[in-house]
UniProtKB/Swiss-Prot annotation:
Site (Transition state stabilizer): H35, T134
Gene3D superfamilies (alphabetical): 2-C-methyl-D-erythritol 2,4-cyclodiphosphate synthase
Keyword Metal-binding applies: yes
Cofactor note: Binds 1 divalent metal cation per subunit.
Domain of life: Bacteria
Name the UniProt record assigns to this protein: 2-C-methyl-D-erythritol 2,4-cyclodiphosphate synthase
Documented EC number(s): 4.6.1.12
HAMAP family: IspF
Record-linked CDD domains: MECDP_synthase
UniProt xrefs under PANTHER family: 2-C-METHYL-D-ERYTHRITOL 2,4-CYCLODIPHOSPHATE SYNTHASE, CHLOROPLASTIC
First-level EC class: lyase
Binding-site positions, a divalent metal cation: D9, H11, H43
Lyase recorded as keyword: yes
Length: 158
């Protein structure tokens, strides 16, 4: 059996950088406002994986009202969520992540993001796709107010 999940996340810019996206620190003059480390890519991916096996979302598993997750490393959250996906008898078939940001440029960091995600999900890097786009200067991402991300995860019965 295969199942598909979709995830979305957004964080506004605020404070000082760097930012963490896809598990990779990216130099930037602005930071991202968040309860955890603000990694929109891993948050969207975590939601996609949890959704694929009907385990809710990242906020249910790691509530932002719980101080133990203040400043949390999103790679650790992703790994914990994936452990729960595996406990339901599923493993990653493939994942696809789309980062939406006017700046900073993501292309130089994509390979490192793919490697980090593949490591966290204990899968082959060929099962992980990460891409970036802009919103052509439209909306909050186009105005440089924040970053958004969508992710899709296909999981297969182990």
């Amino acid at each position: 059996m295969i199942r598909i999940g979709h995830g979305f996340d957004v964080h506004a810019f605020g404070g000082e950088g760097p930012i963490i996206i896809g598990g990779v620190a990216i130099p930037y003059e602005k930071g991202l406002l968040a309860h955890s480390d603000g990694d929109v890519a891993l948050h969207a991916l975590t939601d996609a994986l949890l959704g694929a096996v009907a385990l809710g979302d990242i906020g249910k598993l790691f509530p932002d009202t719980d101080m133990q997750y203040k400043g949390a490393d999103s790679r650790g959250l992703l790994r914990e969520a994936y452990t729960q996906v595996q406990a339901k008898g599923y493993k990653v078939g493939n994942v696809d992540v789309t980062i939406i940001a006017q700046a900073p440029k993501m292309r130089p960091h994509i390979d490192a993001m793919r490697a980090a995600i593949a490591e966290d999900l204990a899968c082959d890097i060929e099962q992980v796709n990460v891409k970036a786009t802009t919103s052509e200067r439209l909306g909050f991402t186009g105005r440089g107010e924040g970053i958004a991300c969508e992710a899709v995860a296909l999981v297969v019965k182990s």
